[in-house]
Amino acid sequence: MITIYTSEEIEKIAAAGKLTADTLSMLEKAVRLGISTLELDEMAEKFIRSRGGIPSCKGYEGFPGSICASVNDTVVHGIPSARKILKKGDIISLDLVVELNGYMGDSCITVPVGHTNKKNAQLLKVTEEALFAGIKQAVPGNTVGDIGHAVESYVRPYGYDVLRDYVGHGIGIEMHEDPEIPNYGTPGHGPRLEEGMVICIEPMVTMGRADIITLRDGWGVVTADGLPAAHCEHTIAITGNGPRILTLRD
């Protein structure tokens, strides 16, 4: 069932989204050569809890981390580890959900470790641009298919692909709510967007094919061809004045 949130509730989701965005801004500055993904995870948890929030990923269906930290060919759900040390030229996606006063915000960025190569840099740029192409379609009267079509159509000319097995979602008082928001679709198809809906649009884009493998830990998802992937996400409120991004970073 799709939940329609009141303007007061959306402000509470926005507060959670602000803490989510602030946490990502802090983490982006902390990303450097030689740091482990577990160190980033610990920094995120401390930051979130010190501001009255809860890192919702921690313990979710048994996930051990406060963030998902996915490096290079890991597309999503990378478990933070003391053994995963960032190297120059790596790319890392940092995905997190924050609960604040009973409401949730969800966002993800993919950033380079220092300078990365041109192919990786283009992948990051195109993935973020595809996110905003999808966001432009998040208006009352459009459909979920309009969003997915915009995302996929944006990345295809670069030879990239989008994951089919993992999608965006509604959000609010739960981390994952209806409707699902795929990164592919047919214009005019799928659930119709209404004012008061809150959704997460999150392109998961592969440099090569979208075939994936789940790691033995049961969480990390890597590209089958070993090529890099990128992941960007915002929490969006559907309003009569256009899409409102609730997780914008300063």
What are these regions (language model features)?
Residues M1-D250:
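Active-site neighborhoods and metal-handling regions in enzymes and metal-associated proteins
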